[in-house]
């Protein structure tokens, strides 16, 4: 199999320019972040932070200072509210399973939206086996939560609600505060979790203002290293660990703390927040250039998700009608443009993105969808190159589709 | 919901870039479609069949992934010049998969769909003619059944979507 991939890579030889836009699924880690991490592998703080020697105490100091910084960026009250986990998936698992198991005496009902990230959907599926039931609140055609249905769904048995701050696929900024008020009004005991991974570093976010009980953030979603994230747990909220092992500074995640990754996550956060307005404006400007350019150059295209200030500034999700998404990602890759598709042409039962289906997109629209996210490192030239390449790529795939595949 | 790596072969990539016999055939004797856009996986086949029941030309259009395009392209090449009987008997999804240098297992169905579409076209030819040869089985073959099953799934999915919309 790896031989096949070598041939695929060889087919990319001679690419003039590369533009990486698949920042939903993985990102570059900028040099500044890597440089900040490197000393922590072999020069300092490489010890176990719970042990009584200099490298251990250095690690302890580093981790506490990192928690402090991230707690500030999130608007948390104290650094102890920050719990590092190996990523967004793990933080969401900890939030949902931990909160549900620890508080099951308060009820066994969970409320989420139809468009929560895959890991949230999967955890609620698993929790069914433990007697928890989940209500999925529908969203409208732009991905906004139906607050009436939310109100109906919450009752005295509801132990937990989980609503992402920003949808990772279509960029919808949810009215989290209103949703939380509705939930708490019906049941003050219900814990409210939000996956804020796609909001952190992109929109103003303050967990104390939002009054959420739990919030997930992820390093790689802000150009930090993969393999690290954090779960904010408001002081006084009861959540137990979900994995067993040796506990150190992170009371809810056993195992030896990964200090270099924590440093990388913190550095990436600093870079995102240092010049927050400028970063965000840059992302928005390039994203708008990208979307406007596509609509100018191509017909039969649809933007998925809302327009304007209710959309996160980095997200572009466009359906190219009469164009199959996976084929388009390969065609673009051969031209040095890297994107992902909401098409799921990889299983017998080919279900496209659950988010696009939830907002009422036809299957053919979902199969032709491409997700892109701009970052502060993209340039005008990157987007110009993308716009040069996209029309011929789409037209070639549409040429293969011809008269077939129109529903 | 999970993702799988898709290490396509050089042959799949080559055929994706330069598919053979692509496009609608205006003078086709028979056309057949398999799959459904709801699945993101659909092929149209066009066959030009002469009086001796030899396939003179074959072409395709594909709403599908690289594997779908590559296998469809291979099938058009394979059936060209064959009698309907040997196209029916000798073109199997396994041969098609071998011809593209193998496929990731989750993409086997693309080859199956391509062969299913050709078999449908052949069946349709005899239906139009009003007589079937003795070698043509009444019962659907594996590939035809698979195509049908995929279409049924698509229908179920679409129904579910409509129900969701009405909610």
What are these regions (language model features)?
Chain B
Residues 38, 48-112:
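Active-site- and interface-proximal helix/loop "cap" or "latch" segments in soluble metabolic
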Residues 22-55:
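Structured beta-strand/loop patches that form or line metal/cofactor-binding pockets in enzymes
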Residues 3, 15-18, 44-47, 66-69:
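Short hydrophobic/aromatic-rich motifs at helix boundaries and adjacent loops
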Residues 2-27, 31-32, 82-167:
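C-terminal binding/interaction regions
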Residues 2, 33, 61-65:
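Short, surface-exposed loop/turn motifs that are enriched in glycine and acidic residues
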């Amino acid at each position: 199999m790896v031989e096949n991939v070598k041939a695929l890579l060889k087919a990319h030889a001679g690419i003039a320019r590369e533009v990486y836009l698949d920042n939903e699924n993985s990102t570059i880690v900028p040099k500044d972040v890597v440089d900040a991490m490197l000393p922590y592998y072999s020069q300092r703080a490489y010890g176990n932070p719970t042990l009584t020697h200099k490298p251990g105490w250095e690690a302890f100091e580093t981790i506490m200072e990192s928690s402090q910084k991230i707690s500030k960026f999130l608007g948390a009250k104290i650094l102890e509210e920050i719990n590092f986990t190996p990523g967004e998936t793990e933080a969401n698992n900890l939030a949902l399973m931990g909160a549900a198991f620890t508080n099951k005496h308060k009820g066994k009902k969970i409320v989420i939206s139809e468009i929560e990230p895959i890991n949230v959907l999967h955890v609620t599926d698993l929790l069914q086996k433990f007697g928890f039931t989940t209500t999925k609140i529908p969203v409208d055609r732009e991905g906004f939560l139906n607050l009436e249905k939310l109100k109906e769904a919450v009752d005295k048995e509801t132990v937990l609600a989980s609503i992402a701050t920003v949808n990772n696929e279509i960029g919808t900024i949810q009215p989290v505060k209103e949703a939380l008020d509705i939930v708490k009004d019906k049941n003050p005991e219900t814990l409210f979790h939000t996956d804020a991974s796609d909001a952190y570093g992109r929109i103003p976010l303050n967990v104390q203002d939002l009054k959420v009980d739990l919030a997930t953030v992820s390093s790689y979603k802000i150009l930090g290293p993969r393999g690290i994230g954090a779960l904010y747990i408001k002081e006084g909220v009861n959540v137990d660990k979900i994995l067993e092992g040796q506990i150190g500074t992170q009371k809810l995640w056993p195992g030896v703390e990964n200090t270099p990754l924590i440093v990388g996550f913190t550095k990436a956060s600093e870079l995102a927040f240092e010049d927050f307005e400028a970063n965000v404006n840059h992302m928005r400007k390039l994203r708008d250039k990208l979307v406007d350019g596509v609509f100018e150059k191509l017909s039969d295209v649809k933007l998925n998700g809302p327009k304007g200030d209710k959309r996160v500034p980095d997200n572009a999700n466009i359906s190219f009608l009469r164009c199959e998404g996976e084929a388009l990602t390969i065609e673009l890759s051969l031209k040095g443009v890297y994107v992902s598709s909401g098409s799921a042409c990889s299983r017998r039962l080919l279900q496209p993105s659950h988010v696009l289906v939830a907002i009422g997109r036809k299957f053919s629209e979902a199969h032709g969808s491409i997700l892109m996210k701009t970052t502060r490192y993209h340039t005008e030239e990157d987007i110009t190159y993308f716009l040069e390449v996209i029309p011929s790529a789409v037209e070639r795939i549409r040429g293969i589709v011809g008269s077939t595949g129109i529903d | 919901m999970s993702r799988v790596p898709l290490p396509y072969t050089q042959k799949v990539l080559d055929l994706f870039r330069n598919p053979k016999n692509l496009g609608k055939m205006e003078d086709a004797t028979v056309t057949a479609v398999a799959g459904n856009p709801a699945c993101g996986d659909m092929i149209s086949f066009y066959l030009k069949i002469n009086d001796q029941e030899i396939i003179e030309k074959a072409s395709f259009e594909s709403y599908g992934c690289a594997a779908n395009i590559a296998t469809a392209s291979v099938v058009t090449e394979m059936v060209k010049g064959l009698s309907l009987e040997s196209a029916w008997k000798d073109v199997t999804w396994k041969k098609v998969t071998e011809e593209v240098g193998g496929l990731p297992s989750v993409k086997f169905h693309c080859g199956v769909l391509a062969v299913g579409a050709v078999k449908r076209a052949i069946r349709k030819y005899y239906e139009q003619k009003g007589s079937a040869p003795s070698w043509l089985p009444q019962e659907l073959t594996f590939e035809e059944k698979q195509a049908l099953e995929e279409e049924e799934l698509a229908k179920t999915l679409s129904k579910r979507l409509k129900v969701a919309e009405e909610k």
